[in-house]
């Protein structure tokens, strides 16, 4: 299969290149950038010297359609809604890593992203690509989930799908490494601001909230809202999500663990920790795994769920490739069979 990557110079695009180089059934046909053309990526990223020689090209839809079977779009939100349309219309596989096609309600997108939404008919066509819970495995136009949304939804799914929790009780405390803010530097991602520091940001206003709610209410329509906070922590990669919920009825630690084990029994990239152990960000670094730990406090009737992912892999490029593997009927782990980098 021939693939093109639009937005190849961003962190998501770079991860796509790294992972696709290990894929047995995929060749990278073309690489595209808005900011640089006619140069190789190694000119900007020396770690790719001798590994990726394809020149960066301007975006020419006719040429991309001619040379490619699949197009990955790894641009910031607000760009893909226009860039993706020719490839969708041409019948290519399209996987969008931005948030432009995740929300079915265009007014919600414009409220939370502050940008004009994609056309409604394209929003209707997009399949939300939470890989472990795809509705249509044959869909060829995928809205890849956000990193916070992925960690949160995988953490909550076993309980919410069976409607076992008090729908008003969901509290999510999510923390991200600095790469989650993207490649373009800002005051909040400056070394002197992030080193030895932790910063709460977008309190009650993060754009992944409606995406999470959209999926949760598909599983349990009675959920009215979630309390969701996000923080930047001084690491390069990783999402560390701590989720608190109250079960409708008391549950034992063993029952809780068995529920998660059975839900994810056939999920290649979700690993449930042994009872009374909890995951760390480092154990999933540079991998497509989501690791989950669980606890139940009988005194407070509160379940604590700890869900960790690498924001650039399971939270972006890795899940995008997992979605490609599902739609193309490749082995789900092709291009993703990495042991996490440790220490």
Curated annotation (Swiss-Prot):
Name listed for the protein in its UniProt record: N-acetyl-gamma-glutamyl-phosphate reductase
GO MF: N-acetyl-gamma-glutamyl-phosphate reductase activity; NAD binding; NADP+ binding
SUPFAM superfamilies cross-referenced by the UniProt entry: Glyceraldehyde-3-phosphate dehydrogenase-like, C-terminal domain, NAD(P)-binding Rossmann-fold domains
Protein's cellular compartments: Cytoplasm
Function of the protein: Catalyzes the NADPH-dependent reduction of N-acetyl-5-glutamyl phosphate to yield N-acetyl-L-glutamate 5-semialdehyde.
Keyword Zinc: no
Enzyme class (EC, first level): oxidoreductase
Pfam families noted in UniProt: Semialdhyde_dh, Semialdhyde_dhC_1
Keywords, sorted A to Z: Amino-acid biosynthesis, Arginine biosynthesis, Cytoplasm, NADP, Oxidoreductase
Record carries keyword NADP: yes
Species annotation: Listeria innocua serovar 6a (strain ATCC BAA-680 / CLIP 11262)
Chief localization: cytoplasm
Catalytic activity entry: N-acetyl-L-glutamate 5-semialdehyde + phosphate + NADP(+) = N-acetyl-L-glutamyl 5-phosphate + NADPH + H(+)
Enzyme Commission number(s) of this protein: 1.2.1.38
Any GO BP annotation: L-arginine biosynthetic process
This protein's pathway: Amino-acid biosynthesis; L-arginine biosynthesis; N(2)-acetyl-L-ornithine from L-glutamate: step 3/4
């Amino acid at each position: 299969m021939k693939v093109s990557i639009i937005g190849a110079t961003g962190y998501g695009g770079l991860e796509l290149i790294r992972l696709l180089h290990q894929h047995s059934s995929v060749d990278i046909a073309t690489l595209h950038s808005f900011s640089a053309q006619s140069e190789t990526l190694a000119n900007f990223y020396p770690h790719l010297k001798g590994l990726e020689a394809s020149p960066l090209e301007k975006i020419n839809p006719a040429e991309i359609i001619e040379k490619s079977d699949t197009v990955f779009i790894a641009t910031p939100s607000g760009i893909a809604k226009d860039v993706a349309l020719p490839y969708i219309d041409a019948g290519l596989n399209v996987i969008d890593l931005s948030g432009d096609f995740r929300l079915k309600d265009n007014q919600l997108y414009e409220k939370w992203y502050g940008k004009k939404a994609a056309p409604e008919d394209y929003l209707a066509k997009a399949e939300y690509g939470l890989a472990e819970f795809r509705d249509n495995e044959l869909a060829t136009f995928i809205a890849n989930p956000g990193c916070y949304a992925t960690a949160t939804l995988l953490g909550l799914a076993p309980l919410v799908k069976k409607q076992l929790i008090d729908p008003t009780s969901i509290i999510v405390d999510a923390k991200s490494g600095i790469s989650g803010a993207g490649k373009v530097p800002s005051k909040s991602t400056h070394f002197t601001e992030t080193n030895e520091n932790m910063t709460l940001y977008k309190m009650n206003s993060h754009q992944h909230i409606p995406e999470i709610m959209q999926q949760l209410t598909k599983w349990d329509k009675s959920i009215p809202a979630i309390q969701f906070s996000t923080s930047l922590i001084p690491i390069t990669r990783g999402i560390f999500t701590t989720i608190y919920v109250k079960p409708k009825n008391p549950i034992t630690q063993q029952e809780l663990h068995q529920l998660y084990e059975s839900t994810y029994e056939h999920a290649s990239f979700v690993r449930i920790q042994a009872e009374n152990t909890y995951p760390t960000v480092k154990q999933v670094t540079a991998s497509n795994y989501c690791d989950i730990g669980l606890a139940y406090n009988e005194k407070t009737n509160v379940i604590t769920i700890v869900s960790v992912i690498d924001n650039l892999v399971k939270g972006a490029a890795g899940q995008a490739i997992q979605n490609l593997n599902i739609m193309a009927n490749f082995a789900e782990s092709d291009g993703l069979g990495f042991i996490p980098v440790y220490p």
